[in-house]
Amino acid sequence: MTMRSAVFKAAAAPAGGNPEQRLDYERAAALGGPEDEPGAAEAHFLPRHRKLKEPGPPLASSQGGSPAPSPAGCGGKGRGLLLPAGAAPGQQEESWGGSVPLPCPPPATKQAGIGGEPAAAGAGCSPRPKYQAVLPIQTGSLVAAAKEPTPWAGDKGGAASPAATASDPAGPPPLPLPGPPPLAPTATAGTLAASEGRWKSMRKSPLGGGGGSGASSQAACLKQILLLQLDLIEQQQQQLQAKEKEIEELKSERDTLLARIERMERRMQLVKKDNEKERHKLFQGYETEEREETELSEKIKLECQPELSETSQTLPPKPFSCGRSGKGHKRKSPFGSTERKTPVKKLAPEFSKVKTKTPKHSPIKEEPCGSLSETVCKRELRSQETPEKPRSSVDTPPRLSTPQKGPSTHPKEKAFSSEIEDLPYLSTTEMYLCRWHQPPPSPLPLRESSPKKEETVARCLMPSSVAGETSVLAVPSWRDHSVEPLRDPNPSDLLENLDDSVFSKRHAKLELDEKRRKRWDIQRIREQRILQRLQLRMYKKKGIQESEPEVTSFFPEPDDVESLMITPFLPVVAFGRPLPKLTPQNFELPWLDERSRCRLEIQKKQTPHRTCRK
C-alpha cells in the first residue's frame, strides 16, 4: 500500500508548478502520508504485470546547466523516466511499476532535472507527454533524499545530480521482472511493519481493500458456512438414525423368519415320520388281508365240492352259509376299507354254482346262521313284513342270494341270463364302483303311507311280465265340486271411485310400508358388507384362513355298513337307487278307447297342408 500510494501521489502532483513543489509531493508519498488525501481517492490501481518501455536517457544537466535533449527529439508521445535521487551512478535499483497518466503541462513549465531555465518554445520540443513510466523508489533512499537537499534545480552554474551526470555508455541495464516491491535494509521497523500490514490486508481482503466492510462481510460469510455445516451434520445424523432403525427392523424380521423356517422343518420331519409309519402299517394290513382272502377262497372250494354231489332241494345250512357268514361277520371292518382289493371276478363262477343249489323263494330267516346276531334277522323280517311298495327294493337281496335252482350241467352263461331276467331292476356283470342307498330297517316306516280310499282312487290291474303276478297301478280320479251360482249383481256395488286422490290415499300406506321394507333391506345389506370387510381385514392381519365348508354327501358312510352281499350282478344305480327294468311296450292310457284314437288319427289326416296351396 505504501509503494502504490507513493506512485499515485507522485503522479497526481500538479503539473503547472516548479520542480521543488513536485519534489515535496514525492517526499510526502515516500513518507507514507494519510490515505484520505484528495489525490489518493482519485488514483487507480496499476496492473502488476505490465511490460515497461525502455527508459530514456537519465535526466541530467550539463555543467553549464543546459537541458539534455530527449532521444526521440522530444516527441509529443514520448515517455520520460524518473530515477531515484539517491541511486548510485551507473546502477538501477530493482523496482516495479507501470505507466501512470499525467496531465499535460503547459509549455512554459520547467522539466525535472533541468536547470531553472524554461524550455524554449521554438527549440522543437513538444509539450509534456501524456503517459510517464514511474518506478517506485525505495523507502530508505526517499527518506535520505528528503533530509538532504539535492541540487535538482539550482542555478545555471550549479552541480547536477550524480545520477544525471553519470551515464552508462553501454546502454541502460535490463529491467527487473514485475513482483512485490523489495524493502530497503535501512528502513525503520515501524515503516516495515506498516507496509507489510497494508500489503497483507490488501491481499487478504475479499473486496480488494483493507477497510472494515471487507472484514464484516467475511465474518458473515464464515457464519453462514458454519450454519450450513451444522445443518448438514444434523441431517446426516437423522439419516443415520433412520437407517439404523431400518437395519434393526430387518434383523428382527430375519430372526422371526428363520424361527418359522426351523419350526416348519421340524413339522415336516414329524409329518414324514408319521407317513412312513402309516404306510408301514397299511402294507402290513394289506398282506394280512390278502392271506385271509386266499384262505377263504381255499375253504370255499373245499366246501363247494361235497355240495355239488347232493341232489336234495333243501340246502344243508352248515357247510357254506355258516362259513361265509362267519367269516364275513368277523371281517366286516377290513372288508369295507379294502373293497377294491377283493378278487370278485375269480369268485363269481364259484358263487353262481353254489347259488344254483338254493331254492328260489327261500327266505333268509330259514337259514340257520349261528354267527349272525338275532337283531339283524329281526330287522330283515320287519323290512319284509312292511306292506309299503317302495320297500320292495329291500326284498331284492334275498332274491339275489337265492336264485332258481337248476341242474348243475347248465353252462354259466345260461345261469347268468336266467338270473338277470329274474331281477326287477337293471343289472350288469361289469364291475364298477356304485352305492345302493337303502334305508336301514326299522320297526316304523320312514314315510307314513297316506290313507288310500277306493272311492277316490281307481285301480287298474296290469299283468306283470317279471314275476307273473298282478300289480296294482294307482291312478288319481277326477273329483266334482259343486259350485253355487252367484246372486244378481247390485249396480251400486260394482261402481268404484277411481279418482287420483282416492287411489293415492288407498295406496299411500302400502307404498310407505314398501319403502320402509326396502330401506330396512338396504341397511341390512350394508351391514353385512361392512361385516364382511371387517372380517377380511381381521383375517389378513392375523393370517387366519377362512374355514372351507365341509363337503357332505347323501350317501351313507362306510362305517354304517350292517350287512354284506357278494354277487356277480351289480345294479345300475342312479342317484342311489337302482333303475327299474322296463319291457318295451307301446304307451297306452287306460281311459282312452280305440274309437277316440281313431278319431284323432282321422282328424290329423284330413287337415290340409298350407304349403300345398299356390
Swiss-Prot record:
UniProt keyword annotation of Cytoplasm present: no
Comp. bias (Low complexity): 158-169, 185-194
Phosphothreonine: modified positions: T396
Molecular function terms from GO: protein-macromolecule adaptor activity
Keyword Coiled coil: yes
Coiled coil (UniProt feature): 213-282
Keyword line: Acetylation, Chromatin regulator, Coiled coil, Isopeptide bond, Nucleus, Phosphoprotein, Ubl conjugation
Residue positions, PTM N6-acetyllysine: K353
The PEHE domain, residue ranges: 472-591
Name used for this protein in its record: Male-specific lethal 1 homolog
Source species: Homo sapiens
